[in-house]
Amino acid sequence: MSGYLNSAALRESDSSQAWHKVLVDYLYPKSATGYATRPRVFADGLAIPLGILPYKNGFYVQHCTEIVFLCDTDGDGKADKREVILSGFGVQDSHLFPHQFTRAPGNWIWFAQGAFNYGKVKTSKGAEVQFDQTRMARFRYDGSDFDITSQGPCNIWGLFMTMEGETWITGANDYGCPAMPFRESGNYTG
């Protein structure tokens, strides 16, 4: 696993596979020492997939202007089905495309977007929502609903939710407060 220590981030799925955010591969199988013996590619050809969330037999991933669900339907460990969940995200600020995908109560997935992206997000039902600059938002697993939940702070770099539902965010410019409690409909400076 030493080749993955400098990655943007790792996520672990329910089946204890570690998912690498940049290469979208997983470490398999685990040896007796608890370390993975080799990476296996689940999906490739993705454009800067900063947002990733393992879920059931696949994962949600941000790919260019879309959030897609890639899944393995035949059990071979590779994505063979692709479903567009949301589309229309801005791609002007590549270092903070939609990211920090986090499961939340009420069957939502929460995420953040960077400061200089401008887009009009389209749901699976065809509704469109203007989604500009730094924002936190949430969407349903099937893409049927999409809501903006806050504005700012400048470039959200971290999102964490406790088991009790308390949510914390961190920003690139912490303004003396490296971690902030997140409040829906909040307007954060920066």
Q: What spans do the regions from the language model cover?
A:
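Beta-propeller domains with acidic blade repeats across secreted/periplasmic ectodomains
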Residues: M1-G190
